[in-house]
């Protein structure tokens, strides 16, 4: 009887030390998987942090990407020697009125 209790105690302690996760969190109606980093052939979901949290991305496999084309985003990545940089494009729009406000005003040297 003592060996049975000892065995149960050892199994209970080992169950707490297991580092693997038995539950895989799914996102986007169980199509994607929450991961720290998506594989190159997978697409990450725009605003996936709402489903997976801020530290993880919602990664959708390539074969299921056609089901949700509006949500999936492919980022352009450029690979350098040790760093991978993601490029994004933004547009800058200025009106002529705001340009005239920024024009320098003449200042007299005597004040």
Swiss-Prot record:
Keywords: Antibiotic, Antimicrobial, Cleavage on pair of basic residues, Defensin, Disulfide bond, Fertilization, Secreted, Signal. Homodimer or homooligomer; disulfide-linked. It is found in: Secreted. Highly glycosylated atypical beta-defensin involved in several aspects of sperm function. Facilitates sperm transport in the female reproductive tract and contributes to sperm protection against immunodetection; both functions are probably implicating the negative surface charge provided by its O-linked oligosaccharides in the sperm glycocalyx. Involved in binding of sperm to oviductal epithelial cells to form a sperm reservoir until ovulation. InterPro entries: Beta-defensin. This is Beta-defensin 126. Residues 21-63 are annotated as: In vitro binds to LPS, mediates antimicrobial activity and inhibits LPS-mediated inflammation. It comes from Gorilla gorilla gorilla (Western lowland gorilla). O-glycosylated; glycans contain alpha(2,3)-linked sialic acids. Its main location: secreted. Disulfide bonds join 27-58, 34-52, 38-59. Residues 1-20 form the signal peptide. Belongs to the beta-defensin family. One of its GO terms (biological process) is single fertilization. GO terms for cellular component: extracellular region.
